[in-house]
Amino acid sequence: MVAPTALKKSDVSEGTVPVTTTSRIVGVDNTEKIDEDDDDADVLIDQDGDAMLVDEENNEESNKKKEDAGVVLDAEGKPRFTSAASSAQTKVKLESRKVSVPPHRMTPLKNNWSKIYPPLVDHLKLQVRMNLKTKSVELRTHPKHTTDPGALQKGADFIKAFTLGFDLDDSIALLRLDDLYIETFEIKDVKTLQGDHLSRAIGRIAGKDGKTKFAIENATRTRIVLADSKIHILGGFTHIRMARESVVSLILGSPPGKVYGNLRTVASRLKERY
């Protein structure tokens, strides 16, 4: 007698056993037939590839979570940081800066103080005070109000420009424009001069009633301060270079007429550029 669990070949062919075409593994389509001649390695490779994709997605999610928590190293061992815009640290830390004021600039600072502190307080959101005991201007950021990380440096540059001898309006330009710089050099850096020779060099740079200095400023769109043997130039990078070349040529002994001719050429080039 045949065992009741055994099935005859004819029974299977006649369809007595139901055959399901859908797979019990959710998400994978197993309805396609695979030939017997096909290699099983291809199937294993595809499964490995799907597993690798899932692992990469999981790694990316874990890396994002780690980036939010702290520093994460990439495959090369370099740290990965989130962008500053997406980070929640928009507040500026409490920092302070002290700018010393020369004795000969204390009186102009006191007279113009009512015009100096409003740009720092209203525009840069800084806390400012003038310390008469130490003869300095103290700047401090406020964590609740200061939003620009470079506000403290801009304020210090503004006060420093005023203490060097620049006009108040020219110094305020440092707060409004980001591409302005101050370059300082001495006459002895160009040529070693002493006594009357040094005085004549300073006079050649200034000119009669300051005409030569004004001509250089207007042609190169800069501002120049002659503080004894020191020369301070305020302006853009290329403009400072043009003004410095004119001043250096005067120190080295070039005739003022030749310098004026070069300034005309420089002014025409600037007009064509802008």
From Swiss-Prot:
CDD domains named among the record's database cross-references: KH-I_PNO1_rpt1, KH-I_PNO1_rpt2
Biological processes per GO annotation: ribosome biogenesis
InterPro entries: KH-I_PNO1_first (IPR055212), KH_dom_type_1_sf (IPR036612), KH_PNO1_2nd (IPR055211)
Similarity annotation: Belongs to the PNO1 family.
Residue ranges, annotated region (Disordered): 1-39
GO cellular component: cytoplasm; nucleolus
Physiological role: Required for small ribosomal subunit (SSU) synthesis. Has a role in the processing of early nucleolar and late cytoplasmic pre-RNA species.
Gene3D superfamilies in UniProt: K Homology domain, type 1
Entry's Gene Ontology molecular function annotations: RNA binding
Keywords (A to Z) from UniProt: Cytoplasm, Nucleus, Ribosome biogenesis, RNA-binding
Coiled-coil zones: none
SUPFAM superfamilies: Eukaryotic type KH-domain (KH-domain type I)
Encoding gene (name): PNO1
Residue ranges of domain KH in the record: 195-247
Full protein name: Pre-rRNA-processing protein PNO1
Compartment(s) where it occurs, according to its Swiss-Prot or TrEMBL record: Cytoplasm; Nucleus, Nucleolus
Main location: cytoplasm
Subunit-structure text: Component of the small ribosomal subunit, ribosomal RNA processing complex (SSU RRP complex).
